[in-house]
Design a protein with these regions (language model features):
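Fungal secretory targeting signals
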Residues: 1-22
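Exposed, interaction-prone regions of secreted/extracellular proteins
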Residues: 20-306
Length: 306
């Protein structure tokens, strides 16, 4: 995006280096870090370096990725996720595929009827794999309900985050003096866009992706840009939950991702299959209403949906 091209010079000069401290932990003990919306995260060998929008280095996540050199894609077999709190609808890209754009819209569903500190990330994004083919990171934006992950409460907000898999923690993007709260029946768009191969002083060339919300409230919702030396291998919709104990802890209506567009740098794939993983563990019914790469539709039906 133009914003990041403007501040690119900041990476060529010494910047003040600070270190983020975890602002919280998940119930399983994984650390949660916060950075301002618009931050940029770049891979440096096995580390991921976080820069504020003004170019100031905020943090280094050490040894969270395997060492890679471009143009490796990292594409390999999808490993089943060893967790009872995650489900996803996804497609796996080919070894020679580069994701250009992944867009969709959704309408915020009716809220759960009970709140008992449960947490949900209902997200859209991209997953990279490590050298063994196991998931290494997930970059996405989400409809968040609940407040155990730094933000939120018994209401919906828009969240942007980078998750280091399987247990490296989260970087959550936040806005200053702006509430990212979303209301039931709001229509929201999500956009994942390839910015190209970038070169920054002190970093090996990396594949740059911007992930953001779109629509009338986009300025009040978080955004993140991430550069890694490996292309995303998995693209899809993901549910992550904690503290769900009964059907009424879920939204009382379905969440439907519509107008799903998945474009490669070579164009829209003529054949694209969406797969489902982990639905039984979450209790959510994942439905591929319409497949393919153009105008696809993915529906999440919750146990309390009536």
């Amino acid at each position: 995006m133009l914003f990041f091209r403007i501040v690119v010079a900041a990476f060529a000069v010494p910047a003040v280096v600070v270190a983020l401290a975890p602002t919280g932990h998940t119930s399983s003990g994984r650390p949660i870090y916060e950075a301002p919306s618009g931050s940029r995260v770049l891979q440096n060998g096995t580390d991921m370096v976080v820069f504020a929008p003004n170019g100031t280095q905020l943090h280094v996540f050490e040894n969270v990725v395997g060492a890679r050199t471009p143009p490796s894609t990292g594409t390999g077999p999808l490993r089943p996720r060893q967790t009872d709190t995650i489900g996803q609808v996804y497609t796996t890209l080919g070894a020679n595929d580069t994701l250009q754009a992944f867009n969709a819209t959704f309408v915020v569903p009716p809220a759960p009827t009970t709140f008992d500190s449960q947490f949900m990330f209902l997200s859209q994004g991209i997953t990279t794999l490590d050298d063994t083919g196991a998931p290494a990171s997930f970059l996405g934006v989400a409809l968040q309900y609940g407040g155990s992950f730094v933000q939120g409460g018994p209401f919906y907000i828009g969240a942007a985050f980078l998750e280091f898999l399987p247990d490296g923690g989260y970087l959550v993007l936040t806005l200053i003096d702006v509430s990212p709260q979303l209301n039931v029946s709001d229509t929201v768009g999500i956009s994942v866009t390839y910015q190209g191969i970038e070169n920054e002083p002190g970093f090996a060339p990396f594949y740059d992706y911007n992930v953001e919300f779109t629509g009338s409230d986009a300025a009040n919702l978080p955004q993140i840009e991430v550069g890694q030396q490996v292309l995303p291998a998995i693209v899809g919709f993901r549910v992550e939950e904690e503290g769900i104990s009964e059907p009424s802890d879920y939204p009382t209506g379905p969440l439907t991702f519509k107008d799903v567009q998945l474009e490669l740098t070579t164009g829209f794939p003529k054949k694209l299959d969406w797969e489902i993983d982990g639905a039984a563990a979450t209790g959510i019914d994942f439905k591929v209403v319409k497949g393919g790469s153009k105008n696809a539709e993915i529906k999440l039906v919750f146990p309390d949906d009536s």
